[in-house]
């Protein structure tokens, strides 16, 4: 683990616009491709009489492995820039991407949007930008990729830029904050250093732009919220819940409550990386032990918080959702599974209160009969089993969710208000 500040980075954009290649290139340029992978390629290259290690080999190999059905997990690859230590959180195309992006399994701080110069804005470009906006990603760096295919044409680059700008304004992203960079992930132009092929461009390289991102501000003033991932029994210690602190801090001596299981007690010890610590804060993965709590008292999906400000348990909640893919239409009474932080609970959409214009967020229709793919709406939701969830304007880390059904992510959303049980 690096002592530089940490950034979670999402790489988003339409399929085949070059996201994997860009990830490969970023890892390659920052010396983060695992040594054994490089060695393997170097040997292959030498055997084939092509001395010298080429980036293309890494990518060819990734492509072959993908064809063999071995997905190269571009998620959770790590690289350093001068000022930051980056983790690439799930990239689209990864089957759980949308779910993970939403449920905070990988809350991204910032995102790189990859748009192919020869294709421009495509359907998933829209979906991912809208998602990024819904989930509170503020800084967007746009890599206009495959510039080599369009002969590094400034005119094409400007056309794509205009098109993306229009999209950002539609979803109310602050377009002035967006940084555009003409790149070729395959050839390496403007990824690590400025390219002579785009002499008309005087902006930073992609790595420079990443290095110039503002530092994420972890919310320490919010109360402790620690979603439980697993519960272990460790001999000599007892029951040890494990999870990531999303907000606030936890220390030995704290009086805590687990919701919705509705049990509590005093924290005895807090451990990180097998060492006892006096305090853990946002982003820390911890195991801790609470006096009087047994293995059967709590479970994955519970949220731990201070007894004086216990996590909220919803009888019903109002949420703003965007429907990404549904084979037909969604009507009141539909009961898919909601994934929020570490919890997975079947929830019924009791009513569809308003249909929104996805571009402006304005109300387009009151009490619509149904919503379908591409629609945004405000809905009232009733969990079928107790669920701890928070309004996203108060604790955003516990205020967003993914809706899954039939093995796919149907919708994403954020909690507007909670009617407590």
Swiss-Prot record:
It is an enzyme of class 3 (hydrolase). Residues 69-73 are annotated as: G2. GO terms for molecular function: GTP binding; GTPase activity; translation elongation factor activity. It catalyses: GTP + H2O = GDP + phosphate + H(+). GO terms for cellular component: cytoplasm. GTP hydrolase that promotes the GTP-dependent binding of aminoacyl-tRNA to the A-site of ribosomes during protein biosynthesis. This is Elongation factor 1-alpha.
